[in-house]
């Protein structure tokens, strides 16, 4: 109510009237939550999947408008165990036919009782559904669909070598439709060859998000196939629909095969189950043995063609695996043959990028290999690496002032230095050996040179001072002048180890008569 003098444009005021009395059939305020409040909107069996309403006449959304003439008219609500009638109007021409291609295979399983495995991740069907279509218009666009529906209202169990009903079926799950990947396609495409639905997967996961068909275990189901004339999958205007079923395709869903005859028949007829046959590799151990045999046999064939003059690295399988090529010739470019490498081995000469050819039956040895074969080093003792100075390392021209690389020592240490050979800070195992060599007629020296270290604060590594022989000015035959020369970080023997840590560039300048730096 408003004041008429202040709001004259609204006219005279009207008094408040009491509300109209409610109809006697209208529920009271306390019963508004009851289901009979809106009886005209109470639709049994409501579902909200309206993608293909023509395939399911019972699909009615709450408050939705009535179905259009292009789809099926609404029918009575279907309970459990009642087959849904196929789409009736509009129909495709009567000459449209569908045949089951692998009908004989389905009959073999149907005579025993077909069982289909369902898993949480989804399992494909075997036998697969393969059909052929005739009577379509060559230029018309068609969709091919498939769905699986229960045939009764019972749950089954395997008892006394047969399937028997064991109670009421589980509540019906939301039905899903499988659309053939070639849809839509012209009729000529569908009729030129059989159509396979082998990609259909069955699952018992009610929360599946992969689009698999959800089924209950221990229930009987029947696949259905539909031909729909439409321009695209989401078209709401269909020109016609025909549905087909084959009684041979009826099956029971299980999580594990119950009938032993079904198991044997699937092993015999399924090409992907050959591993379970009597002549197949059934066990995991047998399969692993077969894989190992395939890996070992090619290696044995390669070893037959391996030349004798080449050194092949062993195949490692531990944490110290080598990343170099298996056929790396690790003895190339060296004056001596190398022992078998271990985890700390580093080749002195960088490996060749081209592996040795295995086609040459008798490869010619290089000069370094000939020299290594002549040395015939058979043991890995400290004496093995004590080479003659004139044969192992090149001699340098005379240098004034004595040794090329004297260690920095004080005056007292210089007076106590012995020539031509002095060893300080060497392990005790080598000191006795070095003294015995120093007292013998001087032909042998450690690595062909003097070893000297200075002071208590000197680095642990020792400098090598090669012997000076003016009479010999050329390098020994077969020695590789490689700027990337590296000494191994160890001597592979049972005694103490000496580390010679010099770069290739420093040794190169040493051999050429230059300075240390």
Swiss-Prot record:
Name used for this protein in its record: T-box transcription factor TBX6
Designated gene of the protein: tbx6
Bias-annotated ranges (Basic and acidic residues): 276-297
CDD domains found in the cross-reference section: T-box_TBX6
Origin species: Xenopus tropicalis (Western clawed frog)
GO cellular component: nucleus; transcription repressor complex
Coiled-coil ranges per UniProt: none
Composition bias type Acidic residues, residue spans: 298-307
Keyword match Transcription: yes
Taxonomy, superkingdom: Eukaryota
UniProtKB keywords: Activator, Developmental protein, DNA-binding, Nucleus, Transcription, Transcription regulation, Wnt signaling pathway
Record SUPFAM superfamilies: p53-like transcription factors
């Amino acid at each position: 109510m408003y004041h008429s003098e202040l709001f004259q444009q609204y006219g005279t005021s009207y008094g408040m009237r009491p509300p109209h009395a409610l109809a006697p059939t209208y529920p009271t305020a306390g019963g508004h939550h009851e289901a009979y409040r809106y009886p005209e909107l109470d639709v049994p069996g409501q579902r909200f999947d309206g993608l293909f309403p023509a395939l399911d006449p019972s699909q009615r959304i709450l408050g939705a408008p009535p179905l259009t003439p292009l789809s099926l008219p609404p029918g009575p609500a279907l309970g459990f165990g009642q087959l849904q009638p196929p789409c009736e109007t509009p129909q495709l021409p009567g000459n449209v036919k569908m045949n089951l291609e692998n009908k004989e295979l389905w009959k073999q399983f149907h005579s025993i009782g077909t069982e289909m495995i369902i898993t949480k991740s989804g399992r494909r069907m075997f036998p697969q559904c393969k059909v052929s279509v005739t009577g379509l218009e060559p230029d018309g666009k068609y969709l091919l669909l498939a769905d699986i529906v229960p045939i009764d209202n019972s749950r089954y169990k395997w008892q006394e070598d047969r399937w028997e009903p064991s109670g009421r079926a589980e509540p019906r799950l939301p039905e899903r439709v499988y659309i053939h990947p070639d849809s839509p396609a012209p009729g000529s495409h569908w009729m030129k060859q059989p159509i396979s639905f082998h990609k259909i997967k069955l699952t018992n996961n009610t929360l599946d998000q992969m689009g698999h068909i959800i089924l209950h275990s221990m229930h009987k189901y029947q696949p259905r196939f539909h031909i729909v004339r439409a321009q695209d999958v989401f078209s709401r205007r269909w020109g016609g629909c025909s549905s087909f079923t084959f009684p041979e395709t009826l099956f029971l869903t299980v999580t594990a095969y119950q009938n032993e005859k079904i198991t044997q028949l699937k092993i015999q007829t399924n090409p992907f189950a050959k591993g379970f046959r009597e002549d197949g590799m059934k066990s995991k151990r047998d399969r692993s043995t077969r894989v190992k045999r395939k890996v070992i046999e090619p290696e044995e064939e390669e070893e037959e063609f391996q030349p004798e003059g080449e050194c092949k690295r062993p195949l490692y399988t531990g944490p110290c695996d080598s990343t170099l090529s298996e056929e790396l010739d690790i003895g190339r470019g060296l004056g001596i043959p190398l022992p078998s490498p271990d985890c700390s081995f580093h080749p002195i000469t960088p490996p060749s990028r081209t592996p040795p050819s295995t086609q040459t039956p008798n490869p010619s040895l290089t000069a370094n290999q000939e020299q290594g074969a002549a040395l015939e080093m058979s043991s890995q003792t400290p004496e093995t690496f004590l080479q003659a100075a004139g044969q192992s390392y090149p001699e340098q021209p005379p240098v004034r002032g004595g040794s090329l690389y004297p260690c920095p020592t004080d005056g007292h240490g210089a007076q106590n230095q012995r020539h031509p050979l002095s060893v300080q800070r060497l392990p005790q195992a080598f000191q006795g050996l070095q003294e015995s060599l120093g007292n013998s007629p001087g032909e042998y020296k450690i690595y062909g040179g003097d070893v000297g270290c200075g002071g208590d604060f000197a680095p642990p590594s020792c400098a090598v001072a090669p012997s000076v022989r003016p009479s010999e000015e050329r390098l020994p035959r077969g020695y590789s002048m490689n700027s990337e020369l590296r000494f191994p970080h160890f001597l592979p023997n049972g005694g103490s180890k000496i580390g010679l840590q010099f770069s290739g560039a420093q040794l190169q300048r040493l051999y050429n008569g230059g300075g240390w730096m």
